[in-house]
Amino acid sequence: MIELSSKIFPRVSTRGFYDLQNGKTLTNTYYEIYPPQKIETIINKSEFVIMIHGLRNNKSGALAKYIIAEKRLKRLHYKHSVIGYSYDSNIVGVQYKSTAISALKTGLIIAKKNGRNLARFILDAKKKNPLAKIRLMGHSLGAQVILSTIEILAKNSKNRNIIESIHLFGGSIPSNSFHPKKFGRSFQMIVNKKIINFYSPYDEVLKAATEEQWVDTPIGYKGSVGLNISKYTQRRVTPRNHRFASYAATLNSFP
């Protein structure tokens, strides 16, 4: 287990659920929680945040992102708990041009499949505590996990407003994702209050990914394109680099 100064960071995990080579599903299990009693305690409180990391994060790398999120939110006087969402994102070959495209495709497959897992955790949490406010925070590829989660939740009208808010940082999803004819209606239905997209034209990773055509123009690079839903807003920021720590430093208020 991953430990931090004698305490185990609360997290939902799907590590080992998907093949890192091709994205194939290896188990029908929805998720695992650590430590169970702490997760149960958090779920039964008035609200909590789920932080979803990006690509190329092993267990320890993911943990670092949760700690960054928790520290930043505490500094902004947010008093509620953060739960980490840990998934198979440590894809081999992303850092090499010769294998980057195939590796990114695998990462995208796994991120999309994790929507099913995260959606189930959210539904289970709301079943135990219907009044809990659940906020999502996603960095880079974590935005895709969130998008896929919203798509699944939107299939049932009973899930209306089940998510309180969403914060995206350097998101890798397409720039037209919040158009009403794309995924906008699903977000408008599922999110109760707001979706905030933190984007940066200076993000070197998203710039390279766009120029190399590894991904469609990401919403975290130059913001949203075209018509957007009313619950969506965006903020242009100047992080030092693509890392979550740099984006988190641009967050001046929460929620």
What are these regions (language model features)?
Residues L118, M137-G142, I146:
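Gly/Ala-rich beta-loop-alpha elbow adjacent to hydrolase catalytic centers
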Residues E47-V49, I134:
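Generic beta-sheet signal
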Residues M1-N44, L55-I68, L73-A132, E151-S165, ...:
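Lipolytic serine-hydrolase domain surface
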